[in-house]
Curated annotation (Swiss-Prot):
The keyword Hydrolase applies. It comes from Thermococcus gammatolerans (strain DSM 15229 / JCM 11827 / EJ3). This is Proteasome subunit beta 1. It is an enzyme of class 3 (hydrolase). Residues 1-10 form a propeptide. It is found in: Cytoplasm.
Amino acid sequence: MNGSPSAMKGTTTVGVVCRDGVVLAADRRATLGNMVTSKEVTKVFQIDDHLAIAGAGLVGDILSLVRLLRAEAKLYRAKVGREMSVKALATLVSNVLHGSRHLPYFAWFLIGGYDVKPRLYSIDAAGGVTEERFIAAGSGMEFALALLEENFSDGMGLDEGIDLAVRAVKAAIRRDVYTGEGVTVVAITKEGYRELEPVLK
């Protein structure tokens, strides 16, 4: 990866709740100002068997939080004997971001997971949390959200959700210069976390 990870920005992320799972998707481009510094950046990360996070913002801040969350998830399992809930992970992220206001994380996070049902949370850089049925974050979010709002329906199947999330990121790729290089797609269902083949076109 070229450039400083702390200065590189990741751009458009998307989350969709389906009947039988949650889909998280993101583009693969990182930029430094107007320069493309990487075409293979990962912006969606597994935290535990049924928990994942997607980040739009400074790559270094995103990776730092992911390391912290993975450690906290392991500690929670060791203490409690089970995986934390999706809401508990969202609350943890919110507390970390809120407590770091004087040295903030420059990123916006989507938390997706499955406990008793599929859940999706959006968390801004100040720690504000909202539960969503669908959401987009990052520089291309307005283009992705327009497509999501027009095409999302409650109770859609997982395959439909995957297709919708990919199309939403592609809509951002077409219109936003900071979004590009294909789409990373992850599905979290009752069976667990599954990363699909990247969509490169």
